[in-house]
Amino acid sequence: MIVGNYGIDFLPREGDVRDYNSALILGADGQRVGRYDKIHLVPFGEYIPYKNLLFFARKLTGRVSEFTRGDQRKVFRLGSPQGGAHRYGVFICYESVFGNEVREFALLGAEVLVNISDDGWYGDTSAPWQHLNMARMRAIENRRWLLRDTNNGVTAVIDPYGRVRQSIPRHAIDALPAQFAFRSDVTFYTAHGDLFAWLCAILALGTVALAGRKLLRQWMASSQVQKSQV
């Protein structure tokens, strides 16, 4: 079982308490397997950037913006009804937006991806559907099944080709029995991240630079011809 959790660490030596936006992983026996603390926090929603400069923001956001950033991506081994254990990569809400970060779970050996999300912030807008489509991209990039569980968004089972195989409508309280498979192959994107995109960007900039240089030479040559005619 994987559930959203308010993680708390007590640090008696420092006299401090740290709060985390966490996912708690429980085994079939009900015992705790581990906890994942969200790493990519939402600015002003989960933490205040540049606290010293934006000191007034604390009064506006309250305690909701005091989460501590997690420091490690983890993959959890859970038993299967068919026997054996499989590796799950669990990430939280907004983290599904960042492909270069989600791929690290696959690199760590995750055979299936799990995204738990609170989409209640968005209301009845297109945002929950956009969030779903971003999760579909993560499934395609890493060629993994992706199980998406939301409180008020689109709960869905997504296959490695980004197709939504099963889903629960928004605002519905329901359970979704799902069939999915475990995969361990490594895609180009999983291995290299946004390398291809960066190469395309460099190629595009180089093409623009060469075209601009050619136009500049033509303009200079035309200017010289006009001056010589005068």
Residue ranges of model-derived segments:
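Enzyme catalytic cores with a strong preference for nitrogen-chemistry domains
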Residues: 1-230
